[in-house]
């Protein structure tokens, strides 16, 4: 019914495009005004727009038509490319903070330049995010002549830029290209520096995310993490792996009626749909016996049970050459969406160590999170977020709910001529691959190039062996040959070429066809399996039929494919049985294709809920992160009044001390617990005071007197240094105490999140419990930070120095030591849960902070001392 109304009245998208077409016509009408101008005159016209916007006399919307018309004319002159009307529409969609869905080959790079040029007029910086360094550099260099013609500076932040000064220069440009990882990690590093001058980013104004579905959907479950060594060790992985292999896999037998309970067999049940493994009652008993413990789920055995959970996942859910490969004595993750090897990335929560134990490679140490953020929360920091991709409509709901982004499908400049055929479904994988090979042979002999998409390295190598046996020449592109990707994809359109590729096939790389190939039917796409996401299938199809080229696509499936086996084969199997399909035969119908798409929708919905669930938890941490980072940024500002902050903390310290001593307003003086105060002063602040010296008649007098005593003692201690040096010492100490406490808090939050799901068994909502407990932990964290700064400031020992130059040098050395430490932590960082192998400091080694004390007596004991020895 909805389709009928859409055909009569037009879809919402059609109406949106119609409005944009009118605006595009208005831009085109301005074209003649600028075509006759000289280059200098055209540049001056654009500079006038910039001045109007920056003075606040005009908004970006006010100057959109002129900006687009000038940029279009400049593009024609400088790049020899004139944006089509549909590209103008795409540019307007991006400017409005929406997602422009544009088919492959429709010139997204040029579309982006229109919105970038307009928004760069404000002078607040525009970021353009791509999926890899190659595309960031390529796009920046291709468009640099255009942007420079318009008076903008252009930068690119890529992995090779190690020097902070170079990175700062790139961010200072009007327009900065880079990858999502580089932008995200620079943000985290900026919030770990000790001087505001060391920050490289200058704010988050406007961002365009290219391949937005890949970054904001596929990578949404991948947090960016900077990590360092941890004191929390878990040495149970080998034992857990050994036990996991001894257990017997069982199955869940569904009850025949509602009155009956499900029956389980064996020691554990594998749930492929949710990628989970659950122990049965029989399994619990077996594991407790093998581990030699009475209760696997008691608090003292938490590490054991966690290790076993990960060992079961590693052995029965994660597959070699599908989810990961073993290379150079390491487990390397295979990106499930691109098929690429993710060098340096590690699974979190001990799963990577469990895989290392499974494959018999070196088990690397676990590490502790120092700073983290998800892409979801990083990109939501921008004042305006927009995106481009060839495939977004299937995820439109998620873009709207999570990022508040609308998706607008931009019409192609030339209608798509590719023919997308119905799926062919076979009973077995063997029959399917036989049919695929026969089709490949037919196309190859005809001379028509064919690109064959596979779901994993394992499947691509299986198909490769069959083609070798049949003597059909071909090229394989999977994560193991990713170095040759550019050339393999470029050659995929040659006459008679047969290219087998995992999902990595060429985002951002064009397969250009000659007239001879187009006459043969263009590029043929064969999918050997449906991906869990329709979007990935659409990307494969989109490799053919670019810019109005002819082409064809078809998927070959079997009932043994994971998607059909786990999510949707019963109905399809029933159809095949009713039709009496024999071995080697297939069915092809729109009804079956719809059934497959429904199975995909189920999986997409499940993944959406998973990402939404992750965001709900991360939002809790994100609110806390904002508070900590905001205060940290204040501390870095030269004009921040750190002395007043210390005064506040000192007052709070006294108030908390009186509360702990059970001394309240209105209480009789005889009941005041003076001994408690005297003992705490000695324990916390390392100075002695007599009871007689602090006796007062009321709570208010006592509070005021104690605050005054602490101020006098502190001022006397700090009198040996200048006011400037005093502020610098207070600031650096505060930063390190804040960072140290935040790191421990992140570890505690990770631990809380790991076990919070068990609250569900007690009829409690785990998310509500997590919010409640993490809030209490955060309040405690803030209190501890304030307390700790007072303790450290009172216990540091400052030497009286006549030579102020030496004092300056000592302080500079302290800063240098801390910054080196931070840089060391961020070496070789990558996506996902980054687990560095930083050397752990032995307890008896000199402390790296420069105090001259042993580590166990300094930072290893009660937090960092910033090169200032603790003393009474």
UniProtKB/Swiss-Prot annotation:
A single GO BP: intracellular protein transmembrane transport
Residue sites binding Zn(2+) per the record: 847, 849, 858-859
Gene3D superfamilies membership: Helical scaffold and wing domains of SecA, P-loop containing nucleotide triphosphate hydrolases, SecA, preprotein cross-linking domain
Reported cofactor(s): Zn(2+)
Taxonomy, superkingdom: Bacteria
Subunit structure: Monomer and homodimer. Part of the essential Sec protein translocation apparatus which comprises SecA, SecYEG and auxiliary proteins SecDF-YajC and YidC.
Similarity comment text for this entry: Belongs to the SecA family.
GO CC annotation: cell envelope Sec protein transport complex; cytosol; plasma membrane
Keywords: ATP-binding, Cell inner membrane, Cell membrane, Cytoplasm, Membrane, Metal-binding, Nucleotide-binding, Protein transport, Translocase, Translocation, Transport, Zinc
Reaction(s) this enzyme catalyzes, per UniProt: ATP + H2O + cellular proteinSide 1 = ADP + phosphate + cellular proteinSide 2
Residues that, per the record, bind ATP: 87, 105-109, 510
Subcellular location: Cell inner membrane; Cytoplasm
Matching InterPro entries: Helicase_ATP-bd (IPR014001), Helicase_C-like (IPR001650), P-loop_NTPase (IPR027417), SEC_C_motif (IPR004027), SecA (IPR000185), SecA_CS (IPR020937), SecA_DEAD (IPR011115), SecA_motor_DEAD (IPR014018)
Organism from which the protein derives: Aliarcobacter butzleri (strain RM4018)
Protein EC: 7.4.2.8
Protein name, UniProt field: Protein translocase subunit SecA
Native organism taxonomy: Bacteria, Pseudomonadati, Campylobacterota, Epsilonproteobacteria, Campylobacterales
Transmembrane feature ranges: none
Reported function: Part of the Sec protein translocase complex. Interacts with the SecYEG preprotein conducting channel. Has a central role in coupling the hydrolysis of ATP to the transfer of proteins into and across the cell membrane, serving as an ATP-driven molecular motor driving the stepwise translocation of polypeptide chains across the membrane.
Gene for this chain: secA
Membrane topology: Peripheral membrane protein
Gene Ontology MF, one: metal ion binding
Cofactor binding annotation: May bind 1 zinc ion per subunit.
């Amino acid at each position: 019914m909805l389709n009928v109304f859409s055909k009569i009245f037009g879809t919402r998208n059609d109406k949106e495009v119609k409005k944009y077409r009118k605006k595009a016509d208005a831009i085109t009408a301005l074209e003649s005004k600028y075509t006759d101008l000289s280059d200098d005159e055209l540049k001056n016209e654009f500079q006038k727009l910039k001045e109007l916007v920056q003075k606040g006399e005009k908004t970006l919307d006010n100057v959109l038509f002129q900006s687009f018309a000038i940029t279009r004319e400049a593009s024609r002159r400088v790049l020899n490319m004139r944006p089509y009307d549909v590209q103008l529409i795409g540019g307007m969609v991006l400017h409005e903070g929406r997602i422009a869905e544009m088919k492959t080959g429709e010139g997204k790079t040029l579309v982006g330049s229109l919105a970038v040029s307009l928004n760069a007029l404000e002078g607040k910086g525009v970021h353009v995010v791509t999926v890899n360094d190659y595309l960031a550099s390529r796009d920046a260099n291709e468009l640099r002549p255009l942007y420079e013609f318009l008076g903008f500076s252009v930068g690119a932040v890529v992995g090779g830029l190690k020097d902070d000064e170079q990175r700062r220069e790139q961010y200072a440009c009007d327009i900065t290209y880079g990858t999502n990882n580089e932008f995200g990690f620079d943000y985290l590093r900026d919030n770990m520096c000790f001087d505001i001058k060391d920050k490289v980013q200058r704010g988050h104004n406007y961002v365009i995310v290219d391949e937005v579905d890949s970054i904001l959907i596929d990578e949404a479950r991948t947090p960016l993490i900077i990590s360092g060594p941890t004191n929390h060790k878990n040495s149970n992985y080998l034992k857990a792996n050994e036990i996991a292999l001894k257990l017997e896999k069982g199955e869940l037998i569904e009850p025949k009626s509602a009155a009956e309970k499900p029956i389980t067999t064996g020691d554990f049940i594998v749930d492929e749909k949710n990628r989970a493994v659950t122990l049965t009652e029989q399994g619990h008993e077996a594991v407790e016996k093998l581990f030699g413990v009475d209760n696997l789920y008691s608090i003292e055995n938490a590490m054991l049970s966690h290790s076993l959970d990960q060992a079961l996942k590693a052995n029965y859910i994660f597959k070699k050459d599908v989810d990961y490969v073993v290379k150079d004595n390491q487990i390397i993750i295979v990106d499930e969406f691109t098929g690429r090897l993710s060098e340096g990335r590690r699974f979190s929560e001990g799963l990577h160590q469990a895989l290392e134990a499974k494959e018999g490679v070196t088990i690397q140490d676990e590490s502790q999170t120092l700073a983290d953020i998800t892409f979801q929360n990083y990109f939501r920091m921008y004042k305006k977020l927009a995106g481009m991709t060839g495939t977004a409509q299937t995820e439109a709901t998620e873009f709207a709910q999570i990022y508040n982004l609308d998706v607008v499908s931009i019409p192609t400049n030339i209608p798509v001529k590719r023919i997308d055929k119905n799926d062919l479904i076979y009973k077995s994988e063997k029959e399917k691959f036989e049919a695929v090979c026969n089709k490949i042979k037919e196309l190859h002999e005809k001379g028509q190039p064919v690109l064959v998409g596979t779901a994993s390295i394992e499947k691509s190598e299986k198909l490769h062996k069959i083609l070798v046996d049949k003597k059909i020449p071909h090229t394989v592109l999977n994560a193991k040959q990713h170095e040759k990707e550019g050339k393999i994809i470029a050659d995929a359109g040659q006459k008679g070429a047969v290219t087998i590729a995992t999902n990595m096939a060429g985002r951002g790389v064009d397969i250009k066809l000659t007239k001879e190939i187009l006459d043969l039917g263009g590029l043929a796409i064969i999918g050997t399996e449906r991906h869990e996401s329709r979007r990935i299938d659409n990307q494969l199809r989109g490799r053919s039929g670019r810019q109005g080229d002819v082409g064809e696509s078809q998927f070959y499936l079997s009932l043994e494919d994971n998607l059909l086996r786990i999510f949707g084969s019963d109905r399809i199997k029933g159809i095949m049985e009713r039709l009496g399909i024999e071995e080697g035969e297939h069915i092809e119908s729109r009804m079956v294709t719809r059934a497959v798409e429904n199975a995909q929708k189920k999986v997409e919905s499940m993944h959406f809920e998973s990402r939404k669930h992750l965001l709900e938890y991360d939002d809790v941490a994100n609110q806390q992160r904002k508070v900590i980072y905001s205060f940290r940024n204040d501390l870095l500002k030269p004009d921040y009044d750190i002395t007043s902050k210390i005064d506040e903390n000192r007052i709070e310290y006294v108030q908390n001390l009186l509360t702990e001593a059970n001394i309240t307003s209105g209480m009789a003086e005889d009941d005041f617990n003076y001994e408690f105060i005297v003992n705490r002063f000695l324990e916390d602040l390392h100075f002695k005071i007599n009871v007689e010296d602090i006796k007062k008649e009321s709570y208010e007098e006592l509070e005021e007197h104690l605050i005054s005593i602490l101020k006098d003692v502190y001022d006397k201690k700090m009198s040996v240094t200048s006011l400037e040096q005093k502020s610098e010492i207070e600031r650096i100490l505060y930063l390190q105490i804040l960072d140290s406490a935040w790191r421990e808090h992140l570890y505690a939050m990770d631990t809380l999140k790991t076990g919070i799901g068990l609250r569900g068994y007690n009829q409690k909502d785990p998310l509500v419990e997590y919010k409640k407990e993490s809030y209490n932990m955060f309040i405690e964290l803030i209190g501890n930070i304030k307390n700790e700064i007072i303790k450290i400031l009172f216990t540091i020992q400052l030497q009286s120095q006549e030579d102020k130059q030496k004092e300056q040098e000592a302080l500079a050395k302290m800063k240098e030591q801390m910054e080196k430490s931070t840089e060391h932590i961020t070496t070789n960082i990558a996506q996902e849960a980054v687990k560095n192998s930083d050397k752990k400091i032995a307890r008896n080694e000199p402390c790296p902070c420069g105090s001259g004390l042993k580590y166990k007596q300094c930072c290893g004991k009660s937090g960092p001392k910033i090169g200032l020895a603790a003393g009474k």
